[in-house]
Amino acid sequence: MGAQETREDASGSSKKRQRPESEVAAESDAAASSTAHAEKFDELNLSSQTLKAIGKMGFTKMTQVQARTIPPLMAGRDVLGAAKTGSGKTLAFLLPAIEMLHSLKFKPRNGTGVIVITPTRELALQIFGVARELMEFHSQTFGIVIGGANRRQEAEKLAKGVNLLIATPGRLLDHLQNTKGFVFKNLKALVIDEADRILEIGFEDEMKQIIKILPNEDRQSMLFSATQTTKVEDLARISLRPGPLFINVDSEKETSTADGLEQGYVVCDSDKRFLLLFTFLKKFQNKKIIVFLSSCNSVKYYAELLNYIDLPVLELHGKQKQQKRTNTFFEFCNAERGILVCTDVAARGLDIPAVDWIIQFDPPDDPRDYIHRVGRTARGTKGKGKSLMFLTPHELGFLRYLKAAKVPLNEYEFPANKIANVQSQLEKLLKTNYELNKIAKDGYRSYLQAYASHSLKTVYQIDKLDLVKVAKSYGFPVPPKVNITIGASGKAPAAHKKRKLARD
């Protein structure tokens, strides 16, 4: 991030001194090569303020992605990075960005010099937290704009001058188009984090508009993506300068998941799924555990149920208000032990400390989602953790896809006589508790709808589900009557009608 110089005139605006390309290239290569083999942060040409902050954070040695990425970024190169979650890439892009703002002596009146775009509000808050620690001893300003937050307060802060801005795509585009006093003409660097996820959740058009609005003259850009798709390549083409440096720290590894991760699966009929989960959570309630489910309604039901039967859990899903999601996220982060029941909203990029177990209670959509889910544990260079995936007998075909994606799993077995048989109590509870019964029915319907929407139709076939057994896992002795709609037609598939999924 050192290919240009900025100086302020009397009015406080930034003026660029254009430098010959040969001078920039030579300086770039020299700077990159001088730190190319650095392993520790103090071997990089960092400011004393940044080194002090890194020391306070407890970091000394760089992860592989940091060692490969930071030197070329500090030398001004555009970077396209492929790194699995838990690799330390947040520090890899924030550190050079902060150093650049420091070296150019950015002040609030210069406006925004760096923008970091990230897919979710939780991930934005996470990056904001890291930025706050890194910038503790710097004078530059930093801020965050995310959907669900107070837009007017954000606009006021932008007008005062935010040098480093972390944002979600929709809210950023809103401010770029509508906020007077938002100075972004001096933008020097753009970071797109979790690019594949940004595109997966439907922000392709917003990203194209954002790229079009932002100044691109002499702008350094970096794009990080856990997976490389055609759409990611298209976004890279319009956002990065020609000839970016491609860094893939995972290509030489034998596995696609973290080295310190023990991974297993258990084969379990649908009617025994909750009983096994309950037994497992009871046994390990002194650990830190994340349980993934496929829908918001399923999360709401199982969280309500577990809390009701005195197994305290936290819940995190997309239907919660932003403040509730933020509070839950930080409460779980700060806890030494506990259980978080959540949807995939928490699966990407969030850095939750010291997670012992990842439980995939509902199956992931594909191997990529599996990898992102288990990326919540065994993070960093020496991280350790375990994961357990629940599969029914007819879902075992998913293991072939995981094997092809270089994911090593072992089968775990749980003795049938050790599984707590609370089925009759569960059914009795739903019979007498109207509210819980209603939430359970919503969860059951949403589970079926999510199942029918799976992309791997050869593995997840709704016709092969035993609805009586599925209903039992939600506490119903017989399947409740529900209506599910799939696709744009708004009609339930013929297979569902045959299974007598009637009106709610």
Swiss-Prot record:
Motif Bipartite nuclear localization signal location, chain numbering: 272-288
Residue stretches of biased makeup (Low complexity): 23-36
One GO term (biological process): maturation of SSU-rRNA from tricistronic rRNA transcript (SSU-rRNA, 5.8S rRNA, LSU-rRNA)
EC number: 3.6.4.13
Top-level taxon: Eukaryota
Domain Helicase ATP-binding: start-end pairs: 70-246
Keywords for this protein: ATP-binding, Helicase, Hydrolase, Nucleotide-binding, Nucleus, Ribosome biogenesis, RNA-binding, rRNA processing
Major subcellular site: nucleus
Location(s), subcellular: Nucleus, Nucleolus
Function: ATP-dependent RNA helicase involved in 40S ribosomal subunit biogenesis. Required for the processing and cleavage of 35S pre-rRNA at sites A0, A1, and A2, leading to mature 18S rRNA.
Family: Belongs to the DEAD box helicase family. DDX18/HAS1 subfamily.
Protein name per Swiss-Prot or TrEMBL: ATP-dependent RNA helicase HAS1
Gene: HAS1
